[in-house]
Amino acid sequence: GQPVLTWWQGTGLGGLAQGTDYIYNSQYQQIATVNAGNGLSADGHEFLITPQNTALILAYTTATADLTSIGGPANQTVIDGVVQEIDIKTGKVLWQWNSADHVPYSQSEQPLPASASSPWDWFHINAVKLDTDGNLLIDARDTWTSYKVDRRSGDILWQLGGKASRNNFNIVAAPGQVLNKAGVITAWQHDFESQGNGIYTFFDNESAGVANTGVDATAQFGLSRAVTVKLDQRTHTATLINSFNQPEGLTAPSQGNSQRTPEGNTVVGWGSLPYFSEFAPNGQLLYNAQFPTGVNSYRAYLLPWNPPSGNGGSGPSYHPSGPNYNPGHGGKDDHGHSGHDHYQHH
């Protein structure tokens, strides 16, 4: 139950990275590291500690696939997304899921590369979370889809978004809300997360950018936003009930997150855009800050953290309305939740 700081450290390019996850205690002492198993390397998109003291992490792996059925080559190099659950104490892989075993390549929105030898990042897994029933929520930027996955079998229980042939929900907008286009809520999205009672939140990038796709891939909706969706499993309806637009009207080609605070506010990290913001439930912008030029953050969180006294605890304190920037993760206890009452910028 002790509070910990977690982060990923490694190398990589274009969102595909290889490295190690670290766990430090409140005295800033290393207490554990987590590595991927089965010959893979941990990617920096996610490191989630579960109530069972296991870690949910992501990895990427390459394979060769026959894509002739979708107009591609017979020997295309592809990049598949992998989820692993790791026993933190032993390093053992307890469970593994590979996107290619469950999702057809035809579901990708990512253009095929010019050469079969150029890896096609068709899925781009970027988040894994726990739903309230203990099953997993997996997000894939390049299929414009979020998946609920059975934690034991790996089967997809339902999917939200993506191509109509496999989307399990009728997508509508509440009064005053605007869809990306008919039947589409998000594009190139990140950070699919359950808020309980059928409420789910996303960071809706609406752009992948030339650097990610090789083409101008800006989607129909003209700016990035944080969105909230209500799922009705009985009627198979997904309703866009709330959205917070990027204050400067910009689109983030990569990264980003949305966090619901205990007070009901929404903290948004704008990813590759050098901003982070906090909104009241009624949409009022409470806080908007900008990093120096050339700096961006994968995610930004408002989290309590009580630093140790002495040299290790230096750093300016701020009022709780100021989000706590963390390079991918933050001050959390071993269940992935915050547990202190002191707020800082890091």
Mark where each language-model region is.
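Ser/Thr/Gly/Pro-rich low-complexity, disordered linker/stalk segments of secreted
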Residues: 311-346
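Histidine-/acidic-rich catalytic cores in large beta-rich domains
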Residues: 1-312
